[in-house]
């Protein structure tokens, strides 16, 4: 039995947002094909996540060094540790996220800030940083209304590229992606584009 963490980063409904459609399609198909796995859902918009700042940075550093912390530092470090430990414990992780203003939603970036911890998800060596999450399987479900996979907009795509870069830095190699794009740019083809992507998500979930 595997523990699978589903991370949802849009608070839009399935009727409003395609990344939520992707999330729900993948989740349902995964549960159907893996009834014995432990599925943990994390809706980032319901978590009230504080931004990474001084107290969290200092607190997590001091905790790692065994140094005395202020009460605010303890509180902030405990918040980051909660999500980091949950992520590390999971055998598989599924991220569903839209492209908003060329990048990921702020809640997802904040969550990733919590996870990027030297000594846990990566380590420093004399040869440079080395990722420590090589045994984790990850799926990225991304939706963007325009076309960013090619052409002049490709250089502006900083959602999927951001997640791939971070996960690669952490050593994740077993990485799978499903992208739905262009449905807003071509409204006459939107239904076909979305349905094709949802089927890809279901197919991936069946073997993930």
From Swiss-Prot:
Residues the entry annotates as binding FMN: 10
Induction remarks: Repressed by YodB. Induced by thiol specific stress conditions, such as exposure to 2-methylhydroquinone (2-MHQ), catechol or diamide. Not induced by oxidative stress due to hydrogen peroxide.
Keywords for the protein's UniProt record, in alphabetical order: Aromatic hydrocarbons catabolism, Detoxification, Flavoprotein, FMN, NAD, Oxidoreductase
Keyword Oxidoreductase tagged: yes
Cofactor(s) required, per the database record: FMN
Enzyme superclass (EC): oxidoreductase
Gene3D superfamilies: 3.40.50.360
Cofactor, free-text remark: Binds 1 FMN per subunit.
GO biological process: catabolic process; response to toxic substance
Single Gene Ontology MF annotation: FMN binding
EC numbers on record: 1.6.5.-, 1.7.1.17
Reaction(s) this enzyme catalyzes, per UniProt: 2 a quinone + NADH + H(+) = 2 a 1,4-benzosemiquinone + NAD(+); N,N-dimethyl-1,4-phenylenediamine + anthranilate + 2 NAD(+) = 2-(4-dimethylaminophenyl)diazenylbenzoate + 2 NADH + 2 H(+)
Keyword NAD: yes
InterPro entries hit by this protein: Flavodoxin_fold, Flavoprotein-like_sf, FMN-dep_NADH:Q_OxRdtase_AzoR1, NADH:quinone_OxRdtase_FMN_depd
Family per record: Belongs to the azoreductase type 1 family.
Subunit note: Homodimer.
Functional summary from the UniProt entry: Quinone reductase that provides resistance to thiol-specific stress caused by electrophilic quinones. Contributes to resistance to 2-methylhydroquinone (2-MHQ) and catechol. Also exhibits azoreductase activity. Catalyzes the reductive cleavage of the azo bond in aromatic azo compounds to the corresponding amines.
Protein name as catalogued: FMN-dependent NADH:quinone oxidoreductase 1
Species of provenance: Bacillus subtilis (strain 168)
The gene coding this protein: azoR1
